[in-house]
Amino acid sequence: GIEVFKVPGRGYRLSSPMTLLDAGEISHGAEGLAWPITVESSVDSTNAEIFRRLDAGVRAPFVLLAERQTAGRGRRGRVWVSPFAENLYCSVVLRVDGGMSQVEALSLTVGLAVAKALQSIGIDGARLKWPNDVLVEGRKISGILLELAGDPADVCHVVVGVGINVNMASDVPAVIRSEER
């Protein structure tokens, strides 16, 4: 949770500053990307929410970010710890014509792109660990989860979920903060 301290005679304050995601600012920074970007305060899973929106008729492509996931997940059903306003939880959905053979190398491509993006902002040593993790100094900083919906031989949607540990709290169990998987 979020630590709040009582300041006698003044009220309350957060234990540390908090910067929330801003869809407008993110859209401005992604100039030239015509895809709708939505930020939610809390979802069970950004990938699961994208599938619900597809089922409700929202057309791909679009981007969904969340401040928190209550049931974040990784490959093979692993839990992805997703506390509020500490890390980045993002999913993107793309329509794929021609079936899943069109996206065979997508997980690798996304992993390399995440590692390169982290390096570009000064996170030295970010490297891809096959098939879907990005590590820094042997510690997992990012995970990628791809899921498909539709006809795997024809028209389908691929949902690309990316979680990046930005400000993982010290009270998160050490096995989650530092485990190399």
Could you describe each region identified by the protein language model?
Residues 12, 133-134:
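Positions that flank functional sites
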Residues 72, 133, 163:
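Active-site glycine-centered loops adjacent to acidic/histidine catalytic or metal-binding residues
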Residues 128-132:
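Alpha/beta catalytic cores of group-transfer enzymes, especially the acyltransferase/condensing modules
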Residues 80-82, 134, 152:
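Generic marker of residues within folded, mature protein domains
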